[in-house]
Amino acid sequence: MTLSTLPLSYCSNVHPGLTVDEVMSGLTEFTLPVREQVGELAAGLWLAQPVIKELLTTDGRLDQFASFLQDHGLTTYTLNAFPYGNFHDARVKENVYLPDWTRDSRVQYTLDCARVLARLLPPEIEWGSLSTVPLGFKEFEHPVDFQDQCAQRLIDLAQSLSRLRDETGRTIRLAIEPEPFCVLETTDETLDFFQRLRKLAADRNLLDEVYDLIGVCYDVCHQAVEFEDVADSLRGLQAAEIAINKVHISCAIRVENPSTNEEARRVLATYAEPRYLHQTMGRSADGTIHRLVDLTKEAALNPDADFAAADEWRIHFHVPVNAESLGPLQTTRPDLKTALETVKTLADCPHLEVETYTWEVLPGAEKPSLIDGLAEEIRATRRLLNNL
């Protein structure tokens, strides 16, 4: 049992790009200079739906893009197929979960991503991965059979991925990414859904395809925000034979003793921003979890009674993974260390990707340049992995 020996990946969703030219420009401007600093590096690509469409419908465009990656020595073995549209819009928030997994557009986009990755995947790499939305956003209205509808679409996708393997010889696996306030957010919810998914797959004689091609993307930040024991969570997924196809190396914000820690709450208020959703959880001494769908300045500065009484808050804000603290704020880096220690013991050998997409919205004038910040994240992650 060991960790993946593939080059460490970092996710390009930190860079905007709604055309192929814009994606290549981001890779040239940021990814290549980061690689110059850190050495071998994989590009975990976020390719929005317009980019995927351009690659598949413009003659020669996909071959041109593949040549660009090869010419620049950039390895790609994973795509982030979670954000469908503009992940750098002025306001993304809950729209990032659209379309959900009942929609034809989500299925088609994901399959198109698989077709692109099958072309980009280097021949020496056995399989590629796609991370995706955890069905949908829990706060939206859904029909009573929503999870069954999603399951049927995922089974359809597994069948299509199996056919793609027959056509191309390339194996592409899906990685469903649980996230706070989504239909799948906790490990228990994920375990329950996979039972449902597999029962329906068996009814369609597609159980083998689902076992092989549908797994999870374990985002350490997300499960830490839920106050889960990440080691137990990972072992529970393995015990249920749910493949961990991808791990997002990520950290969240922690506030200890928030009722008396006014300085931390003042600093936390500066992290409330209009683009991304920052789901917030507070845990009381008796283990009760209090939930807030999005961090606001008011919630940080003047929390309600339940949150004020909590011993600790955790906030879904991806912060640099090399940071143990951010001034008076703490991070969930200890959970990241525990998660990677556990991953090393598992039978699965998931793809490993650093995913800190929030550099543009991080507060503070003293933060490093994006290139230097990403490079330090990669170096810190390598040190962490090497010391396991």
Where are these regions (language model features)?
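Anion (oxyanion) recognition and catalysis
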Residues: 70-73, 238, 317
